[in-house]
Amino acid sequence: MLSFDTNLAVHAANRDSASHAQSRGFIESLAARRDVAICELMLVELYLKLRNERIFTRPLTAAQAVAVCTAYRSNQAWQLIDCAPVMDDVWGLAAKSGFAFRRIIDVRLARTLLHHGVTEFATANVRDFAKLGFERVWNPLTT
């Protein structure tokens, strides 16, 4: 099973992004596949980014951002993942010296996806996920 990172969904939604067409094309290529899972945590992060004026020159309204997230949630071919009993592990990693505070989102996302059987992960930030347990982590924007 495979999943994809928030950054690809953000590029796909952002027409001003140099990676817009490629990200959108990648996500559209997954639309009918039955081996794709998306996580509610990723969608929460997407909602936050869609409304962020530092990312979008014209951020989406609350209703527009929810509509984008709902479109992902409503794909009947994909498995929708909510949460998993991973937080003891996540907190243990987060307590270690040198743990970057924003990394907690990536670690929780990875652990949740792995718990639900995801083995492949597409992201524009391969380095951030390379050692989190997936069999394959790749950047579809460079392949």
Stretches with model-predicted labels:
Residues 38-44, 104:
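Aromatic- and histidine-enriched alpha-helix N-cap/loop-to-helix transition segments
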Residues 1-38, 53-67, 131:
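Short, well-structured N-terminal submotif of metal-dependent ribonuclease cores
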